[in-house]
Amino acid sequence: MFDSSKIQPYIAFTDLREWIREAESLGEVKTVLGASWQEEIGLATDVVVPPDDGPAVIFDEVPGSPKGFRLLINCFAGKRRAMTLGFPQGLTKQELSDAYFTHYQKDPKHIPPVIVDDGPVFENVLTGDAVDIMKFPTPIWHANDGGRYIGTGCYSVTMDPDEKWINAGCYRAMIQDEKSVSLLMVPGKHGYMHREKYFKRGEKMPLALVIGGDPLFFFMAGTEQPYGLCEYDIVGGMRKKPVECVRGKITGLPFPANSEIVFEGYLNNNNRKFEGPFGEWTGYYASDESAQPVLEIEAIYHRKDPIILGVPPIGGGSDEMARYRAIMRSAMLKQQLQSAGVPDVTQVWSHEIGASRMLIALAIKQRYAGHAKQVGVLAASCGASVYGCKMVIVVDDDIDVSNLDQLMWAMLSRYDPATSVDILRRMRSTPADPRLTPEQRKVRDFTNSRMVIDATRPYEWRDQFPKVNAPSQEIVRKARDMFGYLLK
């Protein structure tokens, strides 16, 4: 039986360059020279990102950008998943999530950042006429995108004007011109909440946009953290030491001193430009272009030979965004269910196939009648899972919930369509949901319905349910240890 408490996590990198060296030591980094931003980088991304074990790829010598200005894609796949999270190689994705839960989620030790005077990000400081973001290698990721999205693996640093806490959140950024990008912030997200406070006062919002940096910051910024908790504190706790931050010379906002590229300026409600469309995580161009506030960039900071972190959604299946969110969101949901007092939830998996949002599977050790429905309804509503969910499936603990074949088999053989399904209505959805009606979009009604499926053996006669003819998960693991070499 896997025991995640016996693992001693160690994150061996502190910035993107050290991350690349670690990934290179695993033999999982390739370099492409001369690919065009207009089409070829996007095509290469479509090839390498969907496979579960595709390599990380660095693009250099991109026409239109100085040599040495690089772009990295596909950081979270293959052996790089365990390496990025500080865990040993050889763990399954469910075991990675269990280890993440045990060491980073169950009882987190947050460590606030420290402010330092200088850092590598200030190797180049550009202001005034020198501000020109067009020199950075920024591709058209999808053929019908409305522009060049420099911010896909980025995060926006903002401060609550009242409570003064710092948030780092992921919001896509499209280039408008040499000195500005438009940012799409979705209602309910923490950056949006900060933005609205400034705008209601008639003020611009100070913002630092980190375009290239340590993948851990992007991962933490891209998952649903508690309101008021700074993502820097989370990463500091994971590393067991504080993050070193510098303050921007324009806004005073803190950002990691070893960031690759940072744009600093003010988000202006009175300067809106059309943003989008963009091929989003649902696999669709689900929303048209819309007028969004522009970040007026007053300073660019970047290291020598800077590296953009690119994490574009592929959609229609699994991509690196779905892979990292599956591990982290599953652990977060498990912790939230435990905090709600729900007993014996043995496994949680937020499936990649729905961008780790739409399909959630849970295994339980049944304790009482109604246990499965309790778990399913709560899982459909928790903070880690409520956004964009469409389906929750609850199964018995003999099923590997991260295995779609096992999950579908359990559902088809153990649930009854007439009696095992509950529909929840007016739940929180997302503007990226392609199933929102035109009428909903007109009034910004971003809600959906979702299905809770009880695919457990019926509690009242579970002992009479036919026995399965397959070995237990423990026996399967033993068999793989003994005979896995036959598959190599």
What residue spans do the PLM features occupy?
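Extended, highly charged
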Residues: 1-294, 298-488
